[in-house]
C-alpha cells in the first residue's frame, strides 16, 4: 500500500492547547458513599441520593488526613490537543491514568506546529533545581518564531517527500519534530488528577512548590477548571489542604 500525501500542505502554527471533557462519572457524592462503606456497609448506598454539601466536613477530613482511596471512585475522560513534547511529559503519569494517542503509523500527521506567543517566558536563569524563567527580548522572540517556523517547514517537506516516494508513514514520521501537534484521550480519577495538578501546575496555595513546563501547565489549568465544576467540594478541600494529593 502506498501512502498518498496531501496536496501542497502548508504548515500552520499555534500557541495554545485545547482540552475537552468528553465524558465523566464524577461527583462529590462518589467520595462519600465510598468512604462510608467502612462504617455503614450496604447502608452507604443511601449516600448516593443525599446532598453532599451536608458532608463537606468528611471530604475535608479525608483530604487532610490523606485517606485517598475514596477519591478514586469516579472517572473523567478528556480529549486533548497539544504538542508532542507535552504528551511525552504527560505520560510520565502512569498510576490512575489511561491514554490513547493519535498514531503516526496509521494516519498522515497534519502540519500543525507549536510556536510560543509573546506571553511565553523564554530565558531560564539559575541552576538546575533552582531557577526562574524571565521574559525574552524582542529579538529573541523574533528569532524563536523564525527559526521554529523554518525548521518545521523543512521537516514537513521532507516528510511529504518521503510519503510521495512511497515510504511508509511509520518510517517517514521520524523526521518530524516534537513541536508537532498531536491529540489523545486521557482518562483519570480525581485522585490521579490531583497528583498531576500538584506536580504540573503552580499555585499560591500549594504547600509543595512545583516547576512545571508552561505548556503542560496550560493543559493542567484547563483540566482543573472542568474538575472544579464537577466536584466543587473535593476541589475546595484540595486547595484548603495545600494542593497535595491524598
Where are these regions (language model features)?
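Family-specific signature for flavin-dependent thymidylate synthase
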Residues: 1-246
